[in-house]
Amino acid sequence: HHRRGEDFVDSPILTYLEPAASSTVELVVELFEYQRVEIEVLPTEATVMYAGMLVDTNYFRNHVGSRTFQIASKLKEKQANVSRAYEFLQDDYKTTQEKMSISANAYRFGNDILIAYGNEEEIYTRPLLAKVGNELLNIAEIKAVFVAGRVDKDRIAISARSKTEVNVQLIMEKLGGGGHFSMAACQVEEKTVKETIDKLEEAIDQYLDERG
């Protein structure tokens, strides 16, 4: 459901791009209708797909349309366990501590953009960085959030989230990443967290200048 990037696979058997779709799950379930035989979906599979929609839409808050809820309804018809899907996404105590430590480093960049970052010595997962971004975006006056953290010894990832006014996809593309308007990401190699944040601030400034 992201638009085609520079690293798009060459000569695929099937290309199905729909940037307006809320999630990959939305596209997959739609394809079921075009098959010659009925696709059997087990309740556990439907539950996992429902959880995927929760992640991609930030619990049906971002980038959703009527089709999104139609697909969710179809998964429910396939016996998706909604309560279980939410349980899949709950954090344990250690993860919660890590999220809090990153959030504690958050600072405002301009009036309505928030940048948060992890400690230089710590290794984080990309899903954790995304979760921090989703949670910080709930702050009323904040329009976009960027969360940076080291994901291995050579790479730092940035997870970007926005509401309706800031196109984080364009900002992440300036750093070699991609995504869509309200949800995007990138990774930077062989840089410190501080150097990565500096590059991010430059990309944001450039985007704001271009937007006018």
PLM region descriptions:
Residues H2-A72:
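Short alpha-helices
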Residues H1-R3, G179-H180:
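Histidine-centered active-site/metal-ligand motif
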Residues Y50, V55-G212:
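Hydrophobic helix-and-loop "lid/oligomerization" segment in the mid-to-C-terminal part
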